[in-house]
A protein has these predicted regions:
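N-terminal active-site wall of soluble small-molecule enzyme domains
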Residues: 2-54, 129
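Conserved active-site and cofactor/substrate-binding residues in soluble primary-metabolism enzymes
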Residues: 13, 46, 69, 104, ...
Length: 169
């Protein structure tokens, strides 16, 4: 799950480095571009093209704040995964995502998932919320970052997420 911000900070050389990194990742390992994109439809279309066509990533993280039309250009790539930020692992997530916004996001993403390629980003720092979100989202994949340095505990997270759904971490 390469975080694009570290590559973008290096300018053109960073994009060249990103391409080199992608080439050494084994073909059987999915590449999730941790980009957290979210923009108007036309801009999102260009971001989707760059990450899913040009760079050939298998999935991408996106921000739902601008609504469905900012996510559709990504989800229209039906063979690619799109992980929508729902309840993130950073400490500031409580500023907006709690107590209720994350539930609204889960509901909307479930409604928008017409191609079956949407999933949610749900931080491991909130294991007590995972089953609550699952009741709303249904059986879609979750990307669960935040184990380790950010404070999420693997055992608590796995226990909370246990429902038979394959969960990429």
């Amino acid at each position: 799950k390469p975080n694009l911000s570290y590559f973008e900070a290096l300018g053109v050389e960073g994009f060249k480095l990103f391409e080199r990194v992608l080439k050494v990742i084994p073909d059987d390992m999915p590449i999730i571009a941790d980009a957290k994109r979210g923009d108007i439809g036309h801009s999102s279309k260009r971001y989707a093209h760059a990450l899913l066509d040009h760079f050939g990533c298998d999935a991408v993280t996106v921000n739902p704040y601008m609504g469905q039309d900012s996510i559709e250009p990504f989800s229209d790539y039906q063979s690619k995964g799109v992980f929508v930020l729902c309840l993130t692992s950073n400490s500031g997530s409580q500023d907006f995502q709690l107590p209720h916004l994350h539930l609204h996001v889960a509901e909307k993403v479930r409604q928008w998932n017409r191609h079956g390629n949407l999933g949610l980003v749900v931080g491991a720092t909130h294991p007590e919320k995972i089953s609550e979100i699952r009741k709303i989202s249904g059986p879609m994949p979750y990307l669960i970052p935040g184990v380790g340095a950010q404070g999420g505990e693997l055992e608590k997270t796995l226990k909370a997420a246990k429902d038979g759904t394959k969960i990429p971490c």
